[in-house]
Amino acid sequence: MPLSTDGPTLNLELNLLMFEPILDFVACPDPQGTHRMAYWSWGEKSAAHVVFCVHGLTRQGRDFDLLAQALVASAKDAGLPDIRVICPDVVGRGKSDWLQDPLGYQFPQYAADMAVLLQSLNTQRAIERLDWVGTSMGGVIGMLLSAQKLPVPVQHLILNDIGPPVSWKSILNMKTYVGEVGKFQTVQDAANAMWQISKSFGPHTSEEWLALSQNMVRRLEDGTYCLHYDPQLRVPIRALTEEQAKAGEATLWQIYDLIQCPTLLIRGAESELLSAAAAQEMTQRGARAQVATLPGVGHAPTLTHQDQIDIVLQFLGLPA
């Protein structure tokens, strides 16, 4: 069932941020001890309505700056209960620690970390409503948590160009670039390099892409830049076989079939990762997702353009 994007829109501009997020950390256990996971918090800490926005494989939590602002502003402008938006840097990315054992960069650790963060937030302020927006990897984490009987259940799940099946061709492509963090003289150089492997994100102006790239790099001691994440993320990906990928897909379908909350699948019409047939199957079993298809976009929509933001707002019952 497609979603309409008709109606007035929030007037958000990339270069006019309403406010800055608060950076915080939570300690998460792993087999070697503990690591800190960073998360970016938007909105009032007292808000009982929390939206998690979780990024893709080599991305980080600041990808959601515009969406987070739109969520907070939409509720406030409409006189609805305040919303707090939580955008984690999954371990090994952004401001989070790197794991001692790179084989830990897999979904069981990611989901466990999110459960720890969720428990910490719920202790600070009881969460009455939890929604989840997950791009690619972040969507898989969302499926894992949505299928569980958590003390704070996910009430609305948005999967951004991800489902149980992931094409083997896409995985082979990941094997070629994940871990190649590069070395760049300027942020613009890094942005240009990232664009070469990210054109499937859909049309973006040079200004929009540079804004998305600012938090994708870290500055080295010699003044140059590299991508923000641990290069060892490549270890479990390069070790993955096609047979293991097929077994993982079967397991994810079993998990998807357990999801009972309202679910929206946002799919790039040109996505090579998630086929139209797979998206159709997701409407017929398990969570029986609604589907919003974005023309001219592949994997994965950035959720920075107003039409994409409006789809999220509408599904969550917020005015666009």
PLM features: residue spans?
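The serine-hydrolase catalytic nucleophile loop
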Residues: L57-Q69
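Catalytic histidine-centered segment of alpha/beta-hydrolase-like enzymes
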Residues: V297-D307
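Conserved serine/cysteine hydrolase catalytic core
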Residues: R218-Q284
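The conserved beta1-alpha1 loop
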Residues: F52-G56, R267
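Alpha/beta-hydrolase fold catalytic core
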Residues: M1-F52, A73-I83, D307, L313-A320
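Conserved alpha/beta-hydrolase catalytic His-Asp/Glu region
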Residues: Q185-A239
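Conserved hydrolase catalytic core segment
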Residues: I127-W168
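Active-site loop/oxyanion-hole signature of alpha/beta-hydrolase fold enzymes
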Residues: P31-G33, L66, V72, P81-V133, ...
